Design a protein with these regions (language model features):
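Nucleotide/phosphate-binding catalytic cleft detector across ATP-hydrolyzing
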Residues: 1-16, 20-75, 79-206, 223-225, ...
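A cytosolic small-molecule/anion-sensing beta-strand core signal
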Residues: 220
Length: 256
C-alpha cells in the first residue's frame, strides 16, 4: 500500500474529532480506517482552547494510525462556521498550448484568475468552486480538458473565511504534528456525498445537524450558492430532555 494512494480527512466537531483514512484503488475510494476521540476545546463549532483541541486531534489520529498500521503526516481538514462567505467571480485566460488544446494547466490558471478579487483584510480565500466553463463563448461546459479553443473562461464561487478562525484551526492541526494538504468546506463535501446530481441541479437544501452547531447549505444549478451555520445542535436537544425529565445527560442522550 503506497502512501500516495492514501487520503486522510480530519473532521473537528463539537463532540467528536474524527480522522478518516481512505485508499484510492483503481479509481474507487474505500475507507480503510477511522479514528475517533472526544472533542475538548470546541464550543458550538468554534475553537476555544488550542491545547485541548490539539490533544483531541492527536488522540483521533493515533487511533486511526493503530487501526491501519501507517503513520499519518498529511490531512485534508474540514471547515465551516458563520465566518464562511460565498461570492461570485469570473476568470479568463488565453489557452497556452500551441495546438489550442485545453489542458490541466489552463484550468489551474483560469481558476487562479478568478481569485483576483477584492477581499477584506480580515478575510482570506479558502477555495474556488467552478460553476461552469466557457470556451470561445460556448457556455455550460463542466470539464473543458481536451477541448480546442483560444479563450477559456470560468464562472466560479469564491469561498472565503475569517482569518482568525482559519489560523486557529491551522495552528491546532500543525501543533498536532500534521501537514495540511487543503481546507475543505464541510457543507460542500456533505453535498457531494449526500445529494445526487439532479438534486443539486434542481435545487436542494442540505441540513447537517452536529452536536453544537447546524450547517445549512443551498445547492442550485449544480453548485453551492449559500451556506450558514446555526449555533444550535443535538446537544441542545439532549439538554432539553435532561431538563424536562430531570435525568442525567447520559440518559437523555440515550432517550434522544
Amino acid at each position: 500500500m503506497s502512501n500516495n494512494d492514501i487520503i486522510v480527512s480530519l473532521d473537528i466537531g463539537t463532540s467528536k474529532v474524527r480522522a478518516i483514512i481512505g485508499e484510492m484503488n483503481n479509481g474507487t475510494f474505500n475507507i480503510i480506517g477511522v479514528g475517533s476521540a472526544d472533542s475538548e476545546g470546541i464550543r458550538k463549532g468554534a475553537i476555544v482552547d488550542i491545547d485541548q483541541t490539539v490533544q483531541s486531534i492527536r488522540n483521533a489520529v493515533d487511533h486511526a494510525e493503530r487501526m491501519v498500521g501507517i503513520q499519518i503526516t498529511e490531512v485534508y481538514v474540514g471547515i465551516s462556521g458563520n465566518h464562511i462567505g460565498l461570492q461570485n467571480s469570473h476568470g479568463v485566460v488565453a489557452v497556452s498550448n500551441e495546438d489550442r488544446e485545453i489542458g490541466e494547466e489552463d484550468i489551474e490558471r483560469v481558476l487562479k484568475a478568478a481569485e483576483v478579487i477584492a477581499v477584506p483584510p480580515e478575510r482570506e480565500i479558502i477555495d474556488v468552486v467552478a460553476k461552469q466553463y466557457v470556451v470561445d463563448g460556448l457556455e455550460g461546459i463542466q470539464d473543458p480538458r481536451g477541448m480546442i479553443g483560444v479563450r477559456l473562461e470560468v464562472e466560479a464561487t469564491i469561498v472565503t473565511g475569517g482569518k482568525t478562525p482559519i489560523h486557529n484551526l491551522l495552528r491546532c492541526v500543525e501543533k498536532g504534528g500534521l501537514r495540511i494538504k487543503d481546507l475543505v468546506l464541510l457543507p460542500l463535501g456533505a453535498g457531494q456525498l449526500s445529494l445526487s446530481k439532479d438534486e443539486k441541479v434542481m435545487g436542494s437544501v442540505l441540513v447537517d445537524i452536529g452536536a453544537g452547531s447546524t450547517n445549512v447549505a443551498i445547492f442550485q444549478e449544480g453548485t453551492i450558492v449559500a451556506t450558514s451555520t446555526l449555533p444550535i445542535g443535538g446537544e441542545f436537544v439532549t439538554n432539553d430532555i435532561a431538563y424536562g425529565l430531570r435525568t442525567l445527560t447520559d440518559q437523555a442522550e440515550k432517550v434522544k
